Amino acid sequence: LTRKTWAFFENLIGPDDNWLPPDNYQENPEPRIAHRTSPTNIGLSLLSSLAAHDFGYLTTLQLLDRSQKTLSTMQELERYKGHFLNWYHTQTLLPLYPRYVSTVDSGNLAASLLTFKEGILSLYTLPVLRDDLYKGLTDTIAVLREKTKEPGAFQKIIEDHQEIGTTASVRLSSAKTFLEKLLPAAEAFLDKQKTIGTTESIWWAETLVKQCSNASFELTTLTGWMQDVDQHPKLSEVFRMPVHIPSLNDLMNMTDVLLPRLEKTILNEQGPEEKEWMIELESRIRNARLMAAEMIESIDTLAKQCIELADYQYDFLFDPAQHFFSIGYNVEDHRRDPGCYDLLGSEARLGVYVAIAQGKIPQESWFALGRQLTNTGK
């Protein structure tokens, strides 16, 4: 179910809609995408990407790339006192009229942005590929089996490497072998589906290949050099590689220590072939370090953008006498709605909570929300 749910976001959020989520997709009587979106939708799409990463459907690099595109688009959208407007056209990026600020939408988006920020910051210290890699790929395989009526597809590969999905700290060699076996098998399965499959089965087969390819690329680029260092007699003497997949911070620390030692070893190396091999290895390590540094920079940028985009002015929505938020604000008429959210059970409570946490409104506002009780008859 989670894999199929992510497929909606994966398939419909892309360049055609400026990496914003369409409000809905109509299947009948004819397929149609609603090219409009709201702040709540945008926040949900960011959290869906974060969840997809947690489930192993997206690599860290993919998560950062998709999120950066969405946040960059958000910075282009018209806002009012920091608030995103109620609706935008996802292709023109223009607001839909009448322009309106919804208290509920603003609260939902702010909460999503701040939650997303915390999730992104955790990527510094998480392994670049975790046990979720295995679980995410097996989820996709399960859907593919369902769509193709081939329950035994990839069974041997999955069984041979099931330890990857049962340990929190994945061995680098295990992940590498798993992907080396699964990718060609997935490509062969896709070729078969292109001949005998349906549109849906072909899409899922292509998705499996992409998942494998993206995971393999990230693992190879960031860590592919580690086994070469560990297996080389001269290098392994001066630097012992960890057997488990490192985090981005680990990679930066490891290469900080290793590169100066490797440079010294290269200078002292007399054999031309060995020296050439070490120079090529040094290049791969520098590429890995550069990629890790760029990913860390992207995390920093995304976190800062989230803080900035969740920073609203609340004075025009908030009634300080009652400690209540108005339902919203009509930007066209410069008019605050007279109705207020006065119940804890209302959909505005998340916005109230976030605004208090940001220090924008007093804590008394939380306790001002009504908490009516009723007799259940029990």
Question: Where on the chain are the PLM-derived regions?
Answer:
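Acidic, mature catalytic/reactive cores of soluble proteins
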Residues: L1-K378
